[in-house]
Amino acid sequence: VVEGGHIKVGQEVTCILPKADRPYTAAVITLSDKGAAGEREDKSGPAIVEMLKSAGYDIKETLLLADEQFLLEKELMRLSDQRQVNVIFTTGGTGFSERDRTPEATIAVCDRMANGIAEAIRNYSMTITPRAMFSRAVSGIRKKTLIINLPGSPKAVKESLDFLLPNLEHGLGILRESEGECARK
């Protein structure tokens, strides 16, 4: 129903069918102490949003947080439990700095890990730069929400999503129980 009212005999009715289980919903969280303090512009979060919108995703929320594990855990739980988004992308906080706690927060809230996603992104990124070996990014599942840690740089975010997005909908479809087997056709 697009708008309320009554249908009269003889009135033309148009049926608008939703795309099959689309659009997928997403949230994007940027982790950056300097960004949260207003000392640095967030370019990675908006880059993720732009790429997801271009791919047909419905962006439900974007956040910019300081590198605080408890804050990230709280937001990951809220976005998956209350907002029930299909996928949450984080950017930043995956390196070796003492304040980089994104993987720990993700692991703390996930019911199951999706190690293959982070491994595949890291493996692909290694073909671009050997510094990808320093990523501690992880991916996991909380209830029906997939959580994916991405790097903090806009360039690395774009490279990661160029690699990931063509196959991501299959995994999201399995989580939403609208797709089944992983076997190739």
Each model region followed by its residue ranges:
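Solvent-exposed alpha-helices and their adjacent loops that cap or buttress functional pockets
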Residues: K19-D21, D81, V138-R142
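Short beta-strand segments
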Residues: I29-T30, T90-T91, N149-P151
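Glycine-rich phosphate/diphosphate-binding loop of Rossmann-like nucleotide-binding domains
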Residues: R22-D67
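SAM-dependent methyltransferases
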Residues: K19-A26, M51, R176-K185
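Metal-cofactor-dependent catalytic cores
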Residues: V1-D21
